[in-house]
Amino acid sequence: MSRVTAIISALIICIIISLSWAVNHYRDNAIAYKAQRDKNARELKLANAAITDMQMRQRDVAAL
């Protein structure tokens, strides 16, 4: 009986270790994805601001 208990305990420990590794892996991926998303959002906002500024300048020049 103690041999079966040892095998079951070892199996449970392996499952816990595997699950913790998977959670850590996907957490790291989520953090990297969020950083990329934030960086791209900042760049897009900057590009949109530049386009708006150019359009305003173009209208001002056309008005002259």
Curated annotation (Swiss-Prot):
One of its GO terms (cellular component) is membrane. InterPro entries: I-spanin. It is a single-pass type II membrane protein. The chain crosses the membrane at residues 4-24. Residues 1-3 are cytoplasmic. Its main location: host cell. The keyword Calcium does not apply. Keywords: Cytolysis, Disulfide bond, Host cell inner membrane, Host cell lysis by virus, Host cell membrane, Host membrane, Membrane, Signal-anchor, Transmembrane, Transmembrane helix, Viral release from host cell. It comes from the Viruses. It is found in: Host cell inner membrane. Residues 25-64 are periplasmic. GO terms for biological process: viral release from host cell by cytolysis. Pfam families: Phage_lysis. Component of the spanin complex that disrupts the host outer membrane and causes cell lysis during virus exit. The spanin complex conducts the final step in host lysis by disrupting the outer membrane after holin and endolysin action have permeabilized the inner membrane and degraded the host peptidoglycans. Homodimer; disulfide-linked. Interacts (via C-terminus) with RZ1 (via C-terminus). Part of the spanin complex which spans the entire periplasmic space. The spanin complex is composed of spanin, inner membrane subunit and spanin, outer membrane subunit. Belongs to the lambdalikevirus i-spanin family. This is Spanin, inner membrane subunit. It comes from Enterobacteria phage PA-2. The gene is Rz.
